[in-house]
Amino acid sequence: MKKISDYSLLFKINSPEDLRKLAIEQVEQVCKELREYIIEVLSENPGHLGSNLGTVELTVALHYVFNTPYDRIVWDVGHQAYGHKILTERRESFHTLRKLGGISGFPNPQESEYDAFIAGHASNSISAALGMAIASWLKGENRKIVAIIGDGSITGGLAFEGLNNVSSNPNDLLIVLNDNNMAIDRSVGGLSQSLIKITTSYTYNTIRFKLYNFLKKYSIIKERERGFILRFTNSLKALLTKQHNIFEGLNIRYFGPIDGHNIKELVKVFEDIKSMKGPKLLHVCTVKGKGFGPAENKADVWHAPGKFNPETGERIKVWSENLPSLYQDVFGHTLVELARMNNNIVGVTPAMSSGCSMTFLMKEMPHRTFDVGIAEGHAITFAAGLAKEGMIPFCNVYSSFMQRAYDNIIHDAVLQNLNMILCLDRAGLVGEDGVTHHGVLDLAYLRCIPNITITAPLNEKDLRNLMFTAIQPNAKGVFVIRYPKGYGELKNWEYSFEALPVGKGRKLKEGKEIAVVSIGTIGNLARKAIRLVEKLGISVAHYDMIYLKPIDEELLHEIGKNYRCVVVIEDGTIKGGLGTAVIEFMVQNGYDPKIKQIGVPDEFIPHGTIAELYKLCGMDIKSIVKCLIEEK
């Protein structure tokens, strides 16, 4: 553990205003201390390490040059903004990162005025920043707006929509492309470096601006010809450097690439271009995990490594060999098995192949596995195209990210009754990633769609069997399987496949007084709670629906006829999910049991451990037991 004296400059910075008082030589030391502080805190309190080590100098330079919070910094995704949080009045609370009641792991305007726009999902920064920049222009403000987007996020469709619109409106937006994967070709040679110095210089841009105004004043060019002039100058630059890029084709002035870890160069370039008129993009090259050897060498492993020894780089294992398998690994291994059985099966995922374990199929059958990048809507429509031609796509998307592809599901898949499987990983409350990542809306927003099958397994065996069921001839149309992140319930799950009848649930336990109706893995908590209340003499039946749609009406008739009290338990929002379906059925069929709903309340849930959030929402075992006792 480092002492306060080890952070002689960083711990004196309580806001960017303090940072801006320092000499540039001192700012280099701030970068060193900031990187060390991030490593120290994250070694004990896990979070996103690699991306934050890579943006230290960029973050410091932005706050050193721009007048935040008056000037706006809009982060894309936002998991790389820890340094930003530390410099913006949250250093002392940084140890509470991602903890219940602590600061978020992503920018959140409700947390700080320095967080200009919410982040968590990818590719929204350019559109948001453009709107803010135009608002600033309309109000006659001199506010600078900066969007920070990575080379992964910029592949998203929303980013391209924003880029396409940037030059259509008057604005001085600055886009910083944080390239940490060398996804875009590098400029080479001395001419390119000289051109960067020239095109960012005050003299060049003053002459450029005055020349344009002169031509316009004397009607030599008209406003509508401005784009032609800009394209001409961009073409000239491309001719000189033997390079051209999409940004200049969209009439966005392009600068770079520059070293994203050279703080002096970053500060100089930001100072030179911040007052330039018109939209511009600065291409900054960074190294993910910069300054921490293990993270630089294995960027994928150290993206979010958990606890580790900051001195040795050894990751600290917190799991036991005796734990069940991860649901993600069950999905991955089962998909490989099914693909061996059926040559038409393919895998599709939007940039989450490792997280969802589709890498298993990718390793064995790379020609039948498609990682389409950060493009959820494209992933669904691409899978629909595969299905249209007779393939059987398993499209795996995190539940919260599937929200971005809602229209694609309806228009491109369901309306055509295409046979495809949507696997919603990270369903339910996900824990420390918080409000932008909880997958609690899926049951509700999918249930209202006609001609769709929606399922949720109780355990790993069910997940395996539902994947098998989804490829059977009687499983027509879009087949949804939702399951949570993390460990399952069973140590042995690799049984022979068994198709689960579509639209049929099951009665897990007999009971006389109360009927518990559940769907998904939260049913395991319900089983434990029921065993506890049985010891108190309360007789509780338990029904696992398996299918939300089509729902098992035979089971619901049985429940309506035989129980005066029904407790519905689900790990999704209580508005529109299983509970709503049960209430609708009972009303429509003339049953009048008392119905109690346990699930995610009608509000956005913060970050914290899953256990803490279940307790917060009244979904933990203790809360379920209390409810059953009260309803006796």
From Swiss-Prot:
GO terms for biological process: 1-deoxy-D-xylulose 5-phosphate biosynthetic process; isopentenyl diphosphate biosynthetic process, methylerythritol 4-phosphate pathway; terpenoid biosynthetic process; thiamine biosynthetic process. It comes from the Bacteria. This is 1-deoxy-D-xylulose-5-phosphate synthase. InterPro entries: Dxylulose-5-P_synthase, THDP-binding, Transketo_C/PFOR_II, Transketolase-like_Pyr-bd, Transketolase_C. Homodimer. Belongs to the transketolase family. DXPS subfamily. Thiamine diphosphate binds at H79, G120, H121, A122, G152, S153, N180, F292, E376. Pathway: Metabolic intermediate biosynthesis; 1-deoxy-D-xylulose 5-phosphate biosynthesis; 1-deoxy-D-xylulose 5-phosphate from D-glyceraldehyde 3-phosphate and pyruvate: step 1/1. It is an enzyme of class 2 (transferase). Catalyzes the acyloin condensation reaction between C atoms 2 and 3 of pyruvate and glyceraldehyde 3-phosphate to yield 1-deoxy-D-xylulose-5-phosphate (DXP). Keywords: Isoprene biosynthesis, Magnesium, Metal-binding, Thiamine biosynthesis, Thiamine pyrophosphate, Transferase. SUPFAM superfamilies: Thiamin diphosphate-binding fold (THDP-binding) (SSF52518), TK C-terminal domain-like (SSF52922). GO terms for molecular function: 1-deoxy-D-xylulose-5-phosphate synthase activity; magnesium ion binding; thiamine pyrophosphate binding. The keyword Metal-binding applies. The keyword Transferase applies. Its EC number is 2.2.1.7.
